[in-house]
Amino acid sequence: MSRRVAWLVLAVACGGCAVAPVAPPSSSPDPESFQYWTASGRLALAASGEGGSGSFSWGQRGAETTLSIRGPLGAGAMQVTMDGQSLVVTDADGRHLGTEQASALLRRRLGTDLPLAELRYWMLGVPSPGSPSSVADAAVAPVRVIEQSGWRISYDMFIAARGVSLPERFTATQGGVRLKVIVDDWEVAEAPGQGP
């Protein structure tokens, strides 16, 4: 067999083995299966005629949430810890504030009451199971618009992770309040001890 014929046969064989592009997943995550994850990125909040921005890191370990906010929006640095029963805020001076004081501090710093319990689920691109909700085009996944607790959450971009679509960019609005979230990095673990 000549060299030219050999190259032709090899080219045809490799062409038949080419891998077709894989479409991104079109399903939203099941919150019960996504209990352990971290997300970090940027956020901007406008409320009461004022606005601010900052960076954030969100860690979810089962029912426990740890949200760290840095930059002007957090007035330096602020960490929010929730477990479904209590809320604790650690401010830039290292002071730990219990539920009532923590809620007042968040309202003062952010200019509004953010639905943090629901936001845990909105971060995943799904409604919170704790209150009624409506989903636009429910038959289409991933979810593009959620309406819940007086808020409208619109999703613009998604990233593939563990076979599902996770939000990269979304905006939550209620009246004159507008929260924009951009996730730069997702890390998802299947069980405790496996990361993230």
Sequence positions of predicted segments:
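Flexible, processing/modification-adjacent segments and terminal tails
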Residues: 93-149
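Sec-dependent bacterial lipoprotein signal peptides
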Residues: 1-17
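Bacterial Sec signal peptide processing site at the extreme N-terminus
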Residues: 13-34
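Post-signal-peptide N-terminal segment of Sec-exported extracytoplasmic proteins
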Residues: 33-73, 77
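An acidic-aromatic
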Residues: 64-115
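Glycine-centered tight beta-turn/hairpin loop motif at sheet-sheet or coil-to-beta transitions
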Residues: 49-51, 73, 92-94, 148-150, ...
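Gly/Pro-enriched, hydrophobic low-complexity segments
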Residues: 125-196
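Extended lipid/amphipathic-ligand handling interfaces
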Residues: 56-59, 80-82, 155-160
